[in-house]
Amino acid sequence: MNLLYLGLLLFVTLLTTLYLASSKAIFAFSDWTFHAARVEEIYLNLKSGSFFTFIAARTFHNTGAASFLFYPYIFFYPWAFLRFILSPVNAFYAWYALVTFATATISYFSMKAYSKKSLASFIFSLVYTFAPYRLYLGGAVFGEYLAVIFLPLLFLGIYEVLWGDKKKWYLLAISGALVAYAHILSVFLSLEFAVILFIIKLITSRGISKDRIKSLLLSAGVCVFLVLPVIVPFFTDFIGQGLSSAKPSISYTMGPRYLLLNSFSAQKGWKLSFMLMLTILTAWAFIKSRRNWIIYGLGLFACFLTTRYFPWKLTAGTPFEMVQLTARYLSYASLFLTILLALGSSSVLEEHVTGRKKLALSCSLAVFMALFSLSSLSVYRDTLKHVQDMPKTSANSTQPAPFKRLRDYNYYNQFNYKILFGAFDYMPKSSLTSVQKQNSLLMHQAYLNGKTLTLSPLIKANQISYQVKSEKAADVDLPVIAYKHTTVSVNGQKHAFRRGNRGTVVVGLKRGQNTVTVGYKASPVFYLSIVISILSWLALLIYLVKFKAKYAQ
């Protein structure tokens, strides 16, 4: 049955993706320009022969912003590689299909390992993968979108360590690492629920065995080794460097009425599906086991966290403000409530359906979910029909990127606009103290001998060069951010520099024409972390092969 169900999941994936791709356009809203610029930088660096990307030399207005150092991007490589064989729009939708099918497949096998039921796993995968909130994330919010792929595997790992087979600790290590490589904030959100589950374990089991504690610590330790390349830059380049990050604040919460009523509408967005809302209203009537009551409680609590009735004001000044948008908890609400929906509905169906009827039912469920998803995506398609194309603007424009339509012929127009959300993330705080400073970076303005110069950058991978002519020896303040491992050369010779009041590179020049090149050279510790991480993944793979062989005996 696995092949049948995976085939049906692939069918729904392709149908929904082709429905979007047939528009031959993309709606650039929310975080789209931030992530699209990162993918463009990776693609252009790959094209020039550089595999690693550290700073934004070609995008982000050539400011050298280091969002690549502090925001994981490994899962964007498939999108970047697809750019070599497909047009920009088609490359995105091909990547979108890959992510969707990966979500469906991991969801299916995670639920199969938990429930041991194929039909329940199929229903879970369908409802979870094509949930309205996940469809919304797939339009632009790609950090969360990628993290959602691995949440079912992550909570399967937590279950195995705390209640199931503790020898499967590796599931938690692997899934935790994959979430970290997708979206750091999702690691924090997942830890919240992991702590709740740990407390529930202590209460319901009146403690926890030493073996389970060992498995928990082992999975955490291995996970750290697996994600060292994500962790190390924070220690080598972020801590103590006066850099900014995404602004911590709770900027939006929903009312219960909004969540309830909005969930019964067809379109994608910040909501649950009507199926999950019905699960909330009816699940209590058929839940029998303590385990399912716990899952139900977690689903309700996740919904509660999205609303303004949770005392979010009390979190001011705490790490919990990193959540920013409480709608992020909808991914967790969808996960827990979909487990109940899948278990309950599959039990009822399997009592009355066998043989060929089961095949017909499975196909019908796939068609229903495909139609439901197409209905959810129809508003997006309608938007693409009526919104205007993104117009051209100057290369150093300070105008925020508008919510407009992108096609292959105007795809590159977006990179000349100021990125709407995240343009100044991970820059020195000193560069953000005024709009004038921010705009001076976007407009490539340098300061020399009391004069303002507008310079044109010469770009290579992780490297920005400027031609600067000075009438006398003087310091030049370039529109490129200075980090701990920034490198500077003048006329081909390594040169000392300091950080200016904009957080930018300031370097002393001799009289005459000078070529100043600003680059980034990662710490040797970073490359060591990559080696350790790769060896850890290989060691874990060898362990799994031996473990499976021993387990099979």
Where are these predicted regions, by residue range?
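Membrane-interface alpha helices of multi-pass inner-membrane proteins
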Residues: 157, 169-184, 219-225
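Active-site lumenal/periplasmic loops and adjacent helix-entry segments of GT-C-fold
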Residues: 15-114, 119-152
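Start-transfer (signal-anchor) and selected internal transmembrane alpha helices
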Residues: 1-18, 540-553
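Active-site-proximal, structured, solvent-exposed surfaces of multi-pass membrane proteins
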Residues: 429-553
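Perimembrane helix-loop-helix junctions
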Residues: 190-220
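Hydrophobic, aromatic-rich transmembrane alpha-helices
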Residues: 225, 272-296, 300-301
